[in-house]
Amino acid sequence: MRTLWILAVLLLGVEGNLVQFELLIMKVAKRSGLLSYSAYGCYCGWGGYGRPQDATDRCCFVHDCCYGKVTDCNPKTASYTYSEENGEIVCGGDDPCKKQVCECDRVAAICFRDNIPSYDNKYIQFPAKNCQEKPEPC
């Protein structure tokens, strides 16, 4: 219960898409994105540099690249719509930019779910000094 309260407090100042991304991760991967992926490896969390450390970190790298291709809206604040059909997340709405953001988040949530076995606690709060290699291109 305390963890849920802390999570709620942390999300109070967050708008739109980041909250939706958290909810999507919880729905698809059955984990809290905030607790599991906000400070993991070289790419999960704010920013990112170097080489992804494992398959989970690569999910964040690909998600960052996906957000980087969004040009007509801010992917961190754009609110989108989605539904669940036959157990799959389907991005909807009429705004192509918001739909693109939803697709970035949907693919990342599936990637997190599919790579849970690669998750390694040694990459939680991973020091930035270990992420100095030249990044690979998106």
Curated annotation (Swiss-Prot):
Its EC number is 3.1.1.4. Keywords: Calcium, Disulfide bond, Hemostasis impairing toxin, Hydrolase, Lipid degradation, Lipid metabolism, Metal-binding, Platelet aggregation inhibiting toxin, Secreted, Signal, Toxin. Residues 1-16 form the signal peptide. Expressed by the venom gland. It catalyses: a 1,2-diacyl-sn-glycero-3-phosphocholine + H2O = a 1-acyl-sn-glycero-3-phosphocholine + a fatty acid + H(+). The active site is at H63, D105. GO terms for biological process: arachidonate secretion; lipid catabolic process; negative regulation of T cell proliferation; phospholipid metabolic process. SMART domains: PA2c. It holds the Pfam family Phospholip_A2_1. One of its GO terms (cellular component) is extracellular region. PANTHER family: PHOSPHOLIPASE A2 FAMILY MEMBER, PHOSPHOLIPASE A2, MEMBRANE ASSOCIATED. This is Acidic phospholipase A2 Cvv-E6b. It comes from Crotalus viridis viridis.
